[in-house]
Amino acid sequence: MRLAGLEQGLAAAPDRLGIYLGSGEGQQDFESFTRMMMASIEGESLNVATFTRLGLETLHPLTEVEQEPNMPAGHLAALFDAQGPNLNCLTACAASSQAIGEATELVRRGDADVMLSGGTHSMIHPFGVTGFNLLTALSTRNDEPARASRPFDNDRDGFVLGEGAAMVVLEELEHARARGATIYGEVLGYGSTADAFRITDTHPEGRGATSCIKMALDDAGLGRDDIDYINAHGTSTSVNDRVESLAIKKVFEERAYKIPVSSTKSMMGHLIAAAGATEVIVSLLAIRDGVLPPTINYETPDPDCDLDYIPNAAREAPCQRVLSNSFGFGGQNISLILGRFADA
């Protein structure tokens, strides 16, 4: 809020201010539920009456409400008196990028003057870690945690879970000008597709990712020569990194080898629903500062991942437009194109 110049309020009519948030499951009280479960076991069965009684005696009255995934957006609306559109996006790893894309559309069509948009997720708990382990999605380099996340490297074996939240302020241009806002960039294009394949795997030929990138380029009115940097989804899993590289090559053809690509998940881990919004902010800083973030732990090239992944060290380079990809479990694909704002 401070960076957006909104510390003293949002300078927008409450009914013209909205929230669009990408998130996962809501607040989960695993410890209380586990204690209740253990105390309710009789022989090999769960005594439902005992479980219910213990719940009524020990759980917070808002337990059911707070575990709903739309609660973060609801809390933000109350905090900022945002009486405009209030929406929540539940598309796994693509959620916060999709929230930003859809919030942009709300502003474009005049439904709001200001949208607070981004994502939040907290998955570092027993259920989250166990679940991703069952999917064999996590790295097993427990003896080398700092080197475990290695997108596009030949020896990658899964991602490292991260946690966090990231938000941006999306604002109608004349509204932003009127209050003298500092504009960090603009959303030029937005693409959203589905693989319609397996919920745990991206399509092996990059069908959805390819069409998503093309859709974002078309929405922005840009061609393959107009992108200066790609902030990849880059999860450090065997399939994702290969397929994303393939999709980039299908869209950009020979120019794919000249566009710097990196995955900041190599440094931050995978924030799941919050990943895309975090990477949007990284992309905007790359545009502002002319510094492209690296892919760390890139040591052994993979023949199927043969692009310029900005290995191991940031690179100074002029940057006008960025493609940021987010691909989620379930087959959701989101591509955003961000650009430097040129005030005519």
What would you call each of these model-derived segments?
Residues 1-14, 176-180, 213-229, 251-255:
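Phosphate/pyrophosphate-binding loops at sites that engage ATP/ADP/AMP, CoA/4′-phosphopantetheine
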Residues 28-45, 107-109, 129-142, 204-205, ...:
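A glycine- and small-aliphatic-rich helix-loop capping segment at beta-alpha/alpha-beta transitions
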Residues 12-14, 63-70, 87-95, 263-275, ...:
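Active-site nucleophile and cofactor-binding loops and adjacent substrate-binding regions
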Residues 1, 19, 76, 96, ...:
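Conserved small-residue
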Residues 1-80, 84-90, 120-129, 224-240:
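Conserved beta-ketoacyl condensing-enzyme motif
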Residues 1-7, 69-80, 86-121, 160-181, ...:
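Active-site-proximal alpha-helical scaffold in enzymes
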Residues 111-157, 190-204, 232-241, 258-308:
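Acyl-CoA/ACP chain-elongation machinery
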Residues 143-220, 228-229, 343-344:
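Condensing-enzyme catalytic core mediating Claisen C-C bond formation in acyl metabolism
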